[in-house]
Amino acid sequence: MQRAAVLVRRGSCPRASGPWGRSHSSAAAEASAALKVRPERSPRDRILTLESMNPQVKAVEYAVRGPIVLKAGEIEMELQRGIKKPFTEVIRANIGDAHAMGQQPITFLRQVMALCTYPNLLNSPSFPEDAKKRARRILQACGGNSLGSYSASQGVNCIREDVAAFITRRDGVPADPDNIYLTTGASDGISTILKLLVSGGGKSRTGVMIPIPQYPLYSAVISELDAVQVNYYLDEENCWALNVDELRRALRQAKDHCDPKVLCIINPGNPTGQVQSRKCIEDVIHFAWEEKLFLLADEVYQDNVYSPDCRFHSFKKVLYQMGHEYSSNVELASFHSTSKGYMGECGYRGGYMEVINLHPEIKGQLVKLLSVRLCPPVSGQAAMDIVVNPPEPGEESFEQFSREKEFVLGNLAKKAKLTEDLFNQVPGIQCNPLQGAMYAFPRILIPAKAVEAAQSHKMAPDMFYCMKLLEETGICVVPGSGFGQREGTYHFRMTILPPVDKLKTVLHKVKDFHLKFLEQYS
């Protein structure tokens, strides 16, 4: 026994013998020979390939971060390596990322976030008492008094209460915290609700009505879920208005090949910047009630209204003002976010959705679905709390907060008018009034020769235009084909977020490029 133990410890076992045994050296030699004979795997033998992957994922497209943006990244790297270009920097006007464009954070929000992240600062005299009060309330509702803990899947309870109070103040209509779900940005809420709504196959597949032009999140999620995209076109000749007759046309035609169940509205519009009138919202709600459609109201730009003739009206408010027949029957989910407005806190990924008239059993299914991802980031939830619960009159931080808010929104209003005016001075560019949101979506003339050149490069004409704009000026914008547009029309989306001086530079560069482009291809 002792000798066997020593042999085991030394790793030298006695040779196996008999009809069932072979020496280890013999077995090793055979194994080595087998490995040599076995063919090496080639890439075609991989389990996950473009042919075997989920076809719905492969069908997803997201133009806001598509080929133009990838090319912009390549050009930035070339500039860093010292490769000469006709410009010295890439200006990323493709996305509504306020802080990346130089907008300064709102002081109060960052103070509360600092206190929540490092609670020892609660003892510092450098922070105002109203910021400390909010931070303490948030932390006391978190497990272990820490943002680093999980929250309930629906979100931190006191923050849901603050969201409900915000909606009540905004609309003059009571909001129930039990109908509030905190999300990882508004996008998370939109995709979650669509997951609940999509079902069926063949002609019974769920149809989702979306505006054209649209925010590409919608087409991407619809593709991912294997639903049917049902396009309704906004009226460009009437400042991108939503026409109920167009909704009826789209619905009628869609019923031949799918089961339309969902109507998505973006107000204020992205990429089109229109603000819907109260009458228009009433008409849409009546249409949804009449046709038994579930309403999705994307209202993340509700603070971004610049035209003095326009005012934001929430779908929730108008729904309740239309009376009990509507308010007790129309199913509605509305969405808001930390990313837009005047806060512009995109990176925190904070958001919420409010659901109205959702069946109790479906609410249970919603909580189950949300539980799979545990909870949205608690730091993003805290940021959402400051969006809906900012300083009030009489509080220490109110004056500074009001100055900063008015500065951001006032600047955006000036830049919206500047962009509209300058674009409309350029032959071959038409830009509707930028009533809200933070983008221009001008219509551009692309000559027939340029269309032919684009086709020879296997590009959409506006992709060809935007790629040349990037390569010749360093300005990164998104082609209108990524958002959808009427056949034969071409557009691009550009954010108005850069500082005024840089925005003027961008606009003049676009003007010079466009005139040169027209001359080259006419």
Curated annotation (Swiss-Prot):
GO terms for cellular component: mitochondrion. Keywords: Acetylation, Aminotransferase, Pyridoxal phosphate, Transferase. InterPro entries: ALAT1/2-like, Aminotransferase_I/II_large, PyrdxlP-dep_Trfase, PyrdxlP-dep_Trfase_major, PyrdxlP-dep_Trfase_small. Its EC number is 2.6.1.2. Signal peptide: none annotated. Its cofactor is pyridoxal 5'-phosphate. Specifically induced in fatty liver. Highly expressed in muscle, liver and white adipose tissue. Moderately expressed in brain and kidney and expressed at low levels in the heart. The modification N6-(pyridoxal phosphate)lysine is found at K340. It comes from the Eukaryota. Coiled coil: none annotated. One of its GO terms (biological process) is L-alanine metabolic process. It catalyses: L-alanine + 2-oxoglutarate = pyruvate + L-glutamate. Homodimer. May be responsible for increased ALT activity in hepatic steatosis. Catalyzes the reversible transamination between alanine and 2-oxoglutarate to form pyruvate and glutamate. This is Alanine aminotransferase 2. It comes from Mus musculus (Mouse).
